[in-house]
Amino acid sequence: RYARILSEKRARQGATYEEANDKMFERNYFGMMMVETGDADAFITGLYTKYSNTIKVAKEVIGIQPQYKHFGTMHILNSKKGTYFLADTLINRHPNAETLIDIAKLSEHTVRFFNHTPVMAMLSYSNFGADTEGSPVSVHEAVEYMQQNYPDLAIDGEMQVNFAMDRKMRDAKYPFTRLKGKDVNTLVFPNLSSANSAYKLLQAMNTEMELIGPIQMGLNKPCLLYTSPS
């Protein structure tokens, strides 16, 4: 039954029943098909499978919510200073402006789901257009789009993380930002290397900090793509 449903779903992507039937012997395909058909409420995977393959299967079987072209992952950090939401920590290696826009929109929705009001900084090594080449340009374009289309959302960038985290320093040097007077609680990183390294560094240096995640954002149905801490 699962093979038939998958082959019909992906018939226009070249899938055949025989290929779909072979895939049902793989735990990721079988487990995600259980969720897709309603035979299971959620699927947890990743401990014994390659993460990149797990992402591929999730997009193929469960799919991305129609209002987005990309999905992402968030980690939540609870510390004495407060609660912080970090994205995208596991999925998109080299996001362009379009991907960063989706990550920002997904983060906004997820932060509100956890009953927090997002105050979002789009991070980079550059501040507010100081560098006109490379990854800061993508972040700058994403911020521009978000500010135009979400006028009530507290979001700004691109900015260095020290300015994001220090309200007084940010307000003194960049008083024009939409974040003036606000404490940032949502950090969107420019790429996977920076986001993944940041949350793992914080976790390693502060044993009193609670780490929650990964939290998948943007898939059609619940699927936890777990990564081994080792």
Indicate where each model-derived feature is located:
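Short, flexible loop segments at boundaries between secondary-structure elements
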Residues: 72-83, 216-225
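A glycine- and small-aliphatic-rich helix-loop capping segment at beta-alpha/alpha-beta transitions
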Residues: 50-69, 141-142, 203-212
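A structural-propensity feature for long, helix-poor, extended segments
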Residues: 77-97
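A general structural motif
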Residues: 65-70, 77, 98-114, 208
